[in-house]
């Protein structure tokens, strides 16, 4: 307890929690040993994020070019500032976060958009795709046994929502997944189903490389076209045009998980090439507002039928239906608060 109080005291000295700090981050080193270095002049501001009860949640770095970057204290070993301020060593616990074993599968799995990684014995591939100029495009969990996407997750903020290029349309196998577990574009031929994006092409138009990565087959699900271009397409537009941070000066972030059901009992059947046809498509969304320093979350459930009725549900209910633990890297008290309710005013429903 004494250590925690000293830690919080150090945080309050280093930062004014009611305003942006003039302290800039020099480096962040994670417990995995991975280090992130930042130029002082490339940063717009830095904020330490606290829970309403005063517990430390993490650090948010706003860069001038790439938008915001989040680091959770539960994953940080230490932080060094561009000043004489001493390093910060975080304290605190999070029972269900992606732990050191999970991070061996994917070292990016500490990020807020990640669900809890698969804990069973089946072969899975946890893959992140990124570009040098725009950072992470999206991450996936791929079920090798089922040859199916379990989920795709990504962030949406001003710096990675630029519209610089057009849709590339080149469907190819994921280069990070062994061919024996992969799906090729021609496996959809004659199936009667579209290659339905999870991380949409329209969400990643910063560069040709970034957009091309959304056409990896690991980011697809067999989808009825009238669902893909109808109900689901309208939901994608709402995420992009309403719920994601709007405006180039926004400092907010939307954390997105998109997926479809692939487990027995929740599928419609199989294509002639044994691809699973999901019974439901769904989303888990977590919004961070910088101005209010708060989070809100919502689950979206879309039966895989033409003109199906969309359900807006809590994340707790979505977890019950899917068996997946979403936003597990949030501290437990924040996670429990936002996942058990829907703020109708924030989401406009």
Regions from the PLM with identified roles:
Residues 1, 14, 38-43, 256, ...:
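Generic low-polarity alpha-helical segments
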Residues 21-37:
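Short N-terminal segments immediately surrounding and downstream of signal-peptide cleavage
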Residues 45, 55-349:
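Domain-level detector for secreted/extracellular nuclease and nuclease-toxin modules, and
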Residues 1-23:
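Bacterial Sec-dependent N-terminal signal peptides
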Residues 35-59:
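Short, flexible N-terminal segments of the mature chain
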């Amino acid at each position: 307890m004494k250590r925690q109080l000293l830690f919080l005291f150090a945080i309050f000295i280093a930062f004014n929690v009611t305003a942006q700090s003039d302290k800039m981050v020099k480096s962040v080193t994670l417990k995995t040993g991975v280090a992130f270095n930042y130029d002082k002049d490339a940063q717009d501001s830095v904020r330490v994020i606290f829970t309403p009860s005063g517990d430390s949640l993490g650090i948010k770095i706003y860069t001038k070019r790439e938008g915001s970057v989040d680091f959770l204290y539960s994953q940080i070993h230490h932080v060094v500032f561009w000043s004489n301020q001493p390093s910060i060593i975080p304290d605190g616990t999070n029972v269900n976060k992606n732990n050191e074993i999970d991070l061996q599968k994917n070292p990016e799995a500490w990020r807020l958009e990640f669900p809890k990684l698969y804990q069973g014995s089946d072969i899975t591939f946890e893959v992140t795709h990124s570009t040098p100029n725009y950072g992470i495009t999206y991450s996936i969990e791929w079920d090798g046994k089922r040859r199916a996407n379990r989920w795709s997750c990504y962030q949406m903020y001003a710096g990675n929502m630029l519209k610089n290029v057009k849709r590339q349309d080149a469907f190819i196998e994921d280069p990070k997944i062994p061919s024996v577990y992969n799906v090729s574009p021609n496996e959809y031929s004659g199936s009667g189903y579209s290659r339905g994006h999870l991380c949409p092409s329209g969400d990643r138009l910063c560069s040709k490389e970034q957009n091309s990565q959304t056409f990896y087959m690991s980011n697809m699900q067999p989808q009825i076209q009238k669902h893909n271009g109808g109900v689901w397409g309208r939901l994608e537009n709402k995420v992009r045009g309403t719920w994601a941070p709007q405006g180039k000066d926004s400092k907010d972030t939307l954390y997105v998980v998109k997926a479809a059901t692939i487990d027995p009992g929740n599928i419609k059947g199989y294509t002639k090439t044994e691809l699973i046809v999901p019974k439901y498509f769904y989303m888990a969304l977590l919004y961070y507002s910088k101005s209010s320093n708060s989070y809100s979350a919502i689950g979206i459930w879309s039966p895989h039928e033409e003109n199906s009725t969309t359900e807006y549900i809590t994340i707790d209910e979505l977890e019950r239906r899917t068996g997946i633990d979403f936003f597990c890297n949030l501290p437990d008290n924040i996670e429990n608060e936002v996942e058990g309710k829907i703020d109708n005013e924030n989401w406009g429903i």
